[in-house]
A protein has these predicted regions:
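Accessory DNA-engaging acidic/polar modules
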Residues: 1-200
Length: 200
């Protein structure tokens, strides 16, 4: 299990972002003028807004697709948590989802229930995803930047980063980043070569 896959690609005057669904990302993407491409399943933005788009990805997911240290996070729910007709999110990912009052609830990818229960509830019309009070969940491979921002000891929940022995480095992401950099260097060399030839 690796961190949620975030991919930012430039094509002409646009950039596209492929990322897992997150309501906070959707809301801010629209504010940045992003458009959802249903066929390609990506958000598209004006390439001039790339810095803002990357900042948004880091804010919501903890990474813009660049290699990042991953850690495991433990969340202890002192009070019940619920999502009104929606999933429950934390640390940039979906951690539990119901689909209706009687559907039951399913854990998100890379999430382990250590203690307690996740379930569906509410009414047929206003159903909920519910994490019961006293439940303990472990989220695997969370980007460290967002994990550090979520660490807290509050009345309703305790969020902790597990010991570093559980931390991993996202090797595939590092390899992918290296390939991108090598390709980009080749592009730059080609541009410089063309410019040098033109100047001569």
């Amino acid at each position: 299990m690796n961190a949620p896959l975030i991919s930012i690609t430039r094509s002409g005057s646009d950039i596209s972002v492929a990322s897992p669904f997150h309501p906070a990302f959707v809301r801010r993407a629209k504010e940045l003028g992003g458009k959802w491409d249903a066929a390609a399943k990506v958000w598209t933005f004006d390439a001039r807004d790339e810095d803002d788009v990357r900042a948004l990805c880091c804010e919501v997911y903890g990474t813009d697709g660049s290699p990042v240290k991953l850690v495991d996070v433990r969340i202890t729910y002192r009070h019940a948590a619920s999502g009104d007709r929606s999933a429950i999110y934390s640390c940039g990912r979906e951690i539990a989802r119901a689909w209706g009052r009687d559907s039951g609830a399913k854990l998100g990818e890379g999430v382990k229930l250590v203690e307690g229960r996740v379930r569906s509830g509410g009414s047929a019309k206003n159903w909920e995803t519910v994490i019961d009070a006293g439940s303990v969940l472990v989220l695997r491979d969370v980007p460290e930047p967002i994990a550090l921002r979520r660490v807290c000891d509050k009345e309703d929940r305790l969020v902790e980063i597990l010991p570093s022995a559980a931390a991993t480095v996202d090797v595939p992401a590092l390899q992918a980043e290296r390939e991108k950099l090598v390709a980009r260097m080749a592009e730059i060399d080609a541009i410089l070569s063309t410019q040098t030839a033109s100047a001569a």
